[in-house]
Amino acid sequence: YGVTDWTFVGTSEGSVSAFHAARMNPQLARRLILTSSVWGPTRNGPGLSDADWTALQATLLWVHHQDDPCEFTSYREARRYASRTRAPLVTVRGGGPEKGGACQAFTAHGFVGVERAVVRAMRSWVLTGAVPADVEAP
């Protein structure tokens, strides 16, 4: 297709796939955005706990809701990984109303009620390279 400027994005367990895709395709992946990321082991694998961050050439942005209710995707770990990788973390606050299980899309895990603002922040980073401000529900 002739596209040479790619941004890989992964959410929750998809963060693991996006990380490995970016790591394995450095000629394509200029940027990587990981949202509501799975840190530790689940029944599907090790999460990002065994990721080799030194092998990642893409510029990285973390996006995470401060009140993410999913047991595998704590905000505390998001802060730790952002520090460990020396990559910026956009913190999301507010939103709702929530419905469904803790690790489902219609909770803070999926940025319910603030989806557009979160996408605008990510898009701004892709287009400008400037780290966006934290996202707060109006």
Predicted segments, located by residue:
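Alpha/beta-hydrolase fold nucleophile elbow
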Residues: G2-S12
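Residue in the alpha/beta-hydrolase core beta-strand immediately N-terminal to the catalytic nucleophile
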Residues: T7, R31-I33
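Short glycine-enriched nucleophile-adjacent loop
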Residues: S15-P26, L32
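C-terminal catalytic histidine-bearing segment of alpha/beta-hydrolase fold enzymes
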Residues: A87-P138
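Stable alpha-helical elements in mature extracytoplasmic
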Residues: G14, A18, S49, E77, ...
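The feature captures the conserved acid-bearing segment of alpha/beta-hydrolase catalytic domains
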Residues: S36-G94
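Soluble non-cytosolic domains of exported or imported proteins
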Residues: R23, P69-F72, V112-A117
